[in-house]
């Protein structure tokens, strides 16, 4: 999957990703009015406004950029209607040929981590059938619970030819409270980065890695 992203970057000459992080008060007023006229000032109306704005952003940029990164929590705040808008956004971005990085920052262990991995990158079994959930191309994950939280994602990535971006050093102001703490003279995030690199090498297929490191900076039409 990383090869697909690299190819898209090379084709567009744009090593960037557009964040789709819904903030209703940033959605243009005419889009809000149209959505509220149809669905009322409800969660459904808010989700429709977000979806329509996302669609306009994608329509304006899909041939200029390689990838988008919708932030799932910003959709979840609108309940099930927001989650539906997230899925519609993912599907539409795929239709337009974009790589989709699900900014989900999952970080749990065991069966919970497995469920997150299946839900975002894999397929869930229902009787004799299998269905993709959100079906992003990549997911962001938090490694600070250890390998228990990462290995289920790597397993699904290998099965489905998907990829991960693993948080190593984040840009939030308080990140240094833990990530910069010294262990044997080196900050914790360097140790984590080395482990992420090892996971990537361990699970390479020819020249392709399924695991990448993420050091945070971003731009979004919503900011």
Give the residues covered by each predicted segment:
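Conserved, mostly hydrophobic/aromatic
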Residues: 18, 68, 103, 139
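Catalytic PLP-binding core of fold-type I/II PLP enzymes
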Residues: 87-108
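Glycine-rich, proline-tolerant flexible connector loops at the mouths of alpha/beta enzymes
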Residues: 46, 70-82
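Conserved anion-binding
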Residues: 108-207
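Positively charged, low-complexity/disordered segments
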Residues: 212-223
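Active-site beta-loop-alpha junctions enriched in small/polar residues
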Residues: 19-25, 73-75, 105-109, 142-144, ...
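Acidic (Asp/Glu)-rich catalytic clusters
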Residues: 58-64, 95, 154-159
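N-terminal glycine-rich anion-binding loop in soluble enzyme alpha/beta folds
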Residues: 1-60
């Amino acid at each position: 999957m990383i090869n697909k992203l690299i190819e898209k970057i090379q084709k567009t000459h744009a090593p960037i990703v557009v964040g789709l992080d819904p903030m209703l008060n940033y959605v243009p007023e005419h889009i809000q009015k149209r959505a509220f006229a149809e669905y009322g000032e409800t969660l459904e109306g808010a989700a429709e406004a977000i979806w329509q704005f996302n669609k306009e952003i994608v329509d304006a940029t899909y041939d200029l950029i390689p990838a988008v990164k919708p932030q799932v929590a910003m959709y979840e705040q609108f309940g099930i209607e927001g989650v539906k808008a997230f899925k519609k956004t993912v599907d539409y971005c795929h239709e337009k040929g974009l790589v989709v990085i699900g900014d989900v920052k999952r970080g749990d262990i065991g069966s919970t981590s497995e469920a997150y991995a299946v839900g975002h990158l894999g397929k869930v079994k229902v009787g004799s059938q299998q269905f993709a959930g959100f079906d992003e191309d990549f997911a962001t994950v938090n490694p600070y619970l250890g390998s228990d939280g990462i290995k289920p994602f790597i397993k699904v990535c290998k099965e489905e030819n998907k990829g991960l971006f693993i948080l190593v050093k984040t840009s939030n102001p308080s990140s240094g409270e833990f990530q910069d703490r010294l262990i044997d003279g080196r900050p914790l995030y360097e140790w984590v980065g080395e482990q992420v690199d090892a996971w990537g090498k361990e699970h390479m297929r020819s020249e392709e890695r399924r695991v990448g490191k993420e050091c945070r900076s971003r731009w979004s039409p919503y900011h």
